[in-house]
Amino acid sequence: MKLYSWNVNGLRACMNKGFADFLAAANPDVICLQETKMQREQATFDFPGYEEYWNSAEKKGYSGTAIFTKQAPLNVTYDIGIEEHDKEGRVITAEYPDFFLVTVYTPNSQRELARLDYRMVWEEVFLAYLQKLDAIKPVVVCGDLNVAAEEIDLKNPKTNRMNAGFTDQEREKFRIFKAAGFVDTFRYLHPEEVKYSWWSYMFKAREKNAGWRIDYFMVSERIKDKVKSAEIHNDVFGSDHCPVSVELEL
């Protein structure tokens, strides 16, 4: 089963930059999107062969997630069931026979860490949500987690030490996430590889490959050996992020 995840930074904008051609060429069984930045009723496009599940933020043009899947899930739920965390369209869970697929757009801690306190609360409640699912069947979590886990995961770790996405607090929450039994598939299969999934639009960052790896596929520890590949598709344009993927044999 071939799964892709991509923060498209606005699906309508990405459609104008080749999203449909990318989808046809990659031909994933499932693709999860973050930062769709639209309501489903605004879509003037559809994707034949895929069932579509959308979770949009209450605030128009902000956040939002979607799952497009060839195989109809057994069940689909939206958000995590806690009202204060369920207004921004950040989570969709699709249940398949052998696993839960959860796509997430983790809240950004923002400039001057204005939202870091909220982010810390989010990390705890989201992990608790995943652990409940994991008690039922294995979990595959994908999306923009808004954290570079280690120094290898960003071009300039020293100068970004106190910036959103690389604070000690965010990295500690990621360590706790892994310690709870979730495996970073790319790092598991590529322990030393330097590859990024996001580049600022400023300073010609992508041209210089001054990026961050903040988009992930995480899996329950007990299915890590079912992951046959984990890739970062940094040759695909259309957003400030690039797609990431895994192939699972379940």
Identify the function of each model-found stretch:
Residues 7, 23-41, 101, 130-151, ...:
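Active-site beta-strand/loop signature of hydrolases that rely on acidic residues for catalysis
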Residues 1-47, 51, 57-63, 78, ...:
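N-terminal, active-site-proximal structural segment of metallo-dependent hydrolase catalytic domains
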Residues 60-75, 193, 205-225:
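Conserved beta strand-loop-helix elements of the APE1-like EEP
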Residues 70, 94-97, 220-221, 246-250:
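Active-site beta-strand termini and strand-to-loop segments that position acidic
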Residues 51, 124-210, 214:
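Metal-dependent phosphoesterases centered on the DNase I-like endonuclease/exonuclease/phosphatase
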Residues 1-9, 98-110, 142:
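Active-site-proximal beta-strand elements of phosphoester/diester hydrolases
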